[in-house]
Amino acid sequence: MVMAEDFLASALAAEASSRAPHDPDYPLFHVAPPVGRLNDPNGLIEVGGTYHAFFQYTPEHPRKLVYWGHATSRDLTRWDYHAPAILPDTHQDANGAYSGTAIEVGDHVELWYTGNYKDPETGEREATQCVVTSTDMEHFKKLVPPVIARQPEGYTAHFRDPQVWRDVDGSYRMLLGVQRENLTGAALLYRSSDLRTWECEGEMTFPDAGGAFDAFGYMWECPNLVRLVDEETGEARDVLIICPQGISPEREGFENVFPCIAIVGELVGTELRGADGSFEELDRGTEFYAPQVMARSASSDSGAPTLLFGWAGNAGEDDQPSIETGGWVHCFTAPRALTLRSGRVIARPYLPGLPLAPATLEGAPTDEAGARVAELAGSRSWRLAFDASYEGALSVRIGSDSGLSITLDEGRLTVDLSGTRYPHGGRRIVTLDAGEASRVEILHDRSITEIYLGDGSRVFTTRTFLQGEGAGVTLSGAASVTNVSAVRAD
C-alpha cells in the first residue's frame, strides 16, 4: 500500500530536479507548475491578505497522478510555491484529486474537490465529492470517506467540480457540473445546513431561455456562479460560468477544443431567471479554459474586486515546447477583475504588484521603423497600455524576430502565431465592436500573451513561445497612439 508520505516524497523529488525555473519561457508573474503539468485553477481564496491559488498538478507528468498544487502571493505578481496540498492517496481520489473550490468556515478553510477512482478491471468510474480542511493553510486534513459518495439517479459518473458557498439564508449551497444519462450536460444544485449532509435540489433551470440550454453539449465542466454589479445600471446580476463540452454554435468564435461561456440572469431557487438563451464566450484566444472566481474570507476587503483566473491551456494539447526545454507545461492567466457593463461580462487585468506608469515612445508608429516603447527595451516580461485612433491598421511587434503578429484596426483584431514555436498556431481573427480597439492593454510574460481591448470588453489569451529573444515592443502603422503606460516585470 502506498502511503501519503510516498506520494509527497515523489512530488517533492520531481520538484527538486526541475528544470522549469531555468527555462527562458517560464513565466515570471503568471502561476505555472514547479515541474510537470498544471491545469485547472482550484480552491482560489484570499485569507488575511494572502492570495491562495491551488491548481490541478501532475508533478510526474506524463505519469497521471493528479495532486492539488499550491501557490501564494501578497500582490498577485510574485508567487511562492509550497508542497502539494491534496495528494491522490486514498481510494476516493486514487485516480486524481480533481477540481473544486474553497470556502472559509469559522476558524478554518475547506477545500472541496472531486475524487476520481476508476476500477482497474472494469474501467468503471466513481466520482465523489470530498473535502480537506486547514486552520493555517499549511497543513491539510482529508476527510474520509467522501461527503457525497455518488451521483443522483439519472446522471453518469461525470459528476464533478464543486463550487461551495454560503447563501444569504445561512445555509450552504453546492454547484456541480454533470452529465445526464442521455449524454447531455447540466448543472446540479445541492443544499446543506452543516456542510456534511447534502440534499440535491435539482438541476439549475432556465425558464426564460426557450429551451436553449436543455441539450447544450454533452457535459458541463467547472461551473461557477458569481454575483456582479453592472457598471452602467448599478444592478446586481448572477452570472453562471460554465465550460460546455460538445457545442458548436454557428457564429464567430468557439474555435478551441472546448469553450467557456457566461450566462447572465438572477438565481431564484434553482431557476436562473431572466437568462434569455444568449451567452458569450469569456475569452477569444487560443488558450483559455476552466476559469474560477476567487472566494473571499471574513478578513477580505468588501470593496476589493471579484477576481477570476483561467487555465491558459486546452484539453489534450500538452505538446508545448516547454516540455522539452524545461519539463513543464501550461500556466494560469493573470488575475482578472470582473464586472458587468450593459449585461456583458467585463474582465480587466488586476495586478497590484505590477502597476502601470507613464511610458515614452521613441519615434511614431507611422515612422518606417515604428515607435519603440523605451521603458520595455530588452524586456521579455511586461505590461503595456495605450489609447489608439485609427486611419489604418496598427501592428504590435514583440521583439524583432519573434514570429508573432498582432494587428489592430477599428473593427478587427488579428493574431498570427504561424511564425512562433506555438504548435497550435495559425491565424485567428476577432471581429470587434465599435470603439473596442481604442483602448488596448497587453500583458506579455515570456511565453504567454494576453490582450485586453475596450477596457475589458474583449479578451484574447494565447501561449506564444516566440522565436529568438522576443524582447521589447514596437508599434507601427497608420494609427495615432497616446496615453502610453508600461511596466516591466524582469
Tell where the protein language model's regions lie, with residue ranges.
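Beta-rich accessory regions
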Residues: 11-17, 232-233, 258-490
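Catalytic nucleophile-His microenvironment captured as a short glycine-rich beta-strand/loop
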Residues: 226
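Active-site glycine- and acidic-residue-rich loops that bind
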Residues: 216, 220
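Beta-rich carbohydrate-recognition and catalytic domains
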Residues: 1-161, 166-215, 229-283, 301-303, ...
